[in-house]
A protein has these predicted regions:
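A short, well-structured catalytic beta-strand-centered motif of the EAL phosphodiesterase domain
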Residues: 1-28, 47, 149
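Conserved acetyl-CoA-binding loop-helix of GNAT-fold acetyltransferases
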Residues: 39-42, 165-171
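Flexible loop/coil segments at beta-strand boundaries within sensory signal-transduction domains
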Residues: 1, 16-18, 57, 118, ...
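Short, contiguous acidic/charged loop-to-helix segments that flank catalytic cores in large enzymes
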Residues: 30-34, 106, 158-164
Length: 207
């Protein structure tokens, strides 16, 4: 069934003097000035506003995914911001999905595990983004209670031409589904890739 079940909040900057700026240009500036948490707070609020507007227009995507910087994941402030924004705009926590990467866990696996458990208790969904690009992915799946597995686009770029990539992505999708996770394959851009995933990979969600 072809339908939109969710969206991802991505930030772009239309600068009045320099025109369109990609995140690769301006995010390092935020990071260098320790403002990534502030930017993330703004994105969370804007996402909730957009969800509220869609609800009023009877447009109902299942959820909106928001990328969370690694160092911010274990901050008490993040939970406060999420609860405040969802309450203010009347958004159910289950409509917010927090996307985290393996780098979020590198320095503090126990802290990340605790934080993710707390988010889940409050009703927020958590997704592991760019799965397969790190060396410890499987150990993270064992400890971190993520609900969604997002497979990195590098595994689908050469599918179906590459039999090796095809075998890998099929196995990873099967792994996620066997763990009762929703599986999303990122970077799907061609009809051939869509058909391959439907016919050979248990029909995961695509992005």
């Amino acid at each position: 069934e072809n339908k939109v079940i969710g969206v991802e909040a991505l930030i772009r900057w239309q600068h009045p003097r320099h025109g369109f700026l990609s995140p690769a240009i301006f995010l390092p500036i935020f990071e260098a000035n320790n403002r990534m948490n502030d930017l993330t707070d703004w994105i969370i609020n804007e996402a909730c506003i957009q969800l509220r507007d869609w609800q009023q227009e009877e447009i109902f995507p299942k959820r909106v995914a928001i990328n969370i910087p690694g160092p911010y994941l274990t901050s008490n402030r993040l939970m406060d911001v999420l609860k405040s924004a969802t309450k203010k705009y009347g958004i159910p926590p289950k409509a917010i999905e927090l996307e985290i990467t393996e780098t979020s866990f590198v320095k503090t696996i126990s802290g990340a595990e605790k934080a993710v458990n707390e988010f889940c208790k409050e009703g927020f969904s958590v997704a592991l983004d760019d799965f397969g690009t790190g060396v410890s992915s499987l150990s993270y799946l064992k400890r971190i209670p993520v609900m969604t597995l997002k497979i990195d686009k590098s595994f689908v770029d050469d599918v179906p031409a590459s039999t090796k990539d095809a075998s890998i992505i099929k196995s990873v999708v099967q792994l996620g589904k066997s763990l009762n996770m929703e599986v999303v394959v990122e970077g799907v851009e061609t009809e051939e890739q869509v058909q391959f995933l439907i016919e050979h990979c248990y029909a995961p969600y695509i992005q």
